[in-house]
């Protein structure tokens, strides 16, 4: 993903927040709801490996089913150029990278 890229005709990437071993996390604007969100994407070298795509999808599904004030909410999931999920953005908290 690149700064300025629009995903699903809805989410505009504005900033790279950080990266983990298998993924990047970006700050984005949800153009439909006019809110800031975070988008986690699988790194390109894992996209071609189905086991990693499935693992990433399970991560999104599992997190989406959790409901706790200390856990970010998952809003959306999809596969464009790479799998991604959209989650609640919390200002100044990079712990969401480690979901």
Give residue ranges: language-model regions.
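AlphaC helix of the eukaryotic protein kinase fold
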Residues: 43-65
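Protein kinase glycine-rich loop
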Residues: 14-20, 25
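Activation-segment/catalytic-loop signature of the eukaryotic protein kinase fold
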Residues: 77
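A short, low-complexity linker immediately N-terminal to eukaryotic Hanks-type protein kinase catalytic domains
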Residues: 1-13
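Conserved small/polar residues in nucleotide/adenosyl-binding loops
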Residues: 97-99
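Conserved N-lobe motifs of Hanks-type protein kinase catalytic domains
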Residues: 19-20, 66-69
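Conserved N-lobe loop of protein kinases adjacent to the ATP-binding glycine-rich P-loop
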Residues: 29-36
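Conserved short submotifs of the Hanks-type protein kinase catalytic core
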Residues: 80-94
């Amino acid at each position: 993903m690149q700064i300025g890229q629009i995903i699903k005709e809805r989410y505009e990437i504005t900033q790279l927040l950080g990266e983990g071993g298998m993924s990047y996390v970006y700050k984005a604007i949800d153009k439909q709801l006019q809110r800031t969100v975070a988008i986690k994407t699988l790194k390109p070298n894992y996209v071609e490996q189905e086991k990693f795509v499935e693992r990433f999808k399970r991560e999104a599904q599992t997190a989406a089913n959790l409901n706790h004030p200390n856990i970010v909410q998952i809003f959306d999931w999809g596969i464009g150029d790479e799998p991604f999920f959209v989650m609640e953005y919390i200002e100044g908290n990079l712990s969401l990278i480690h979901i």
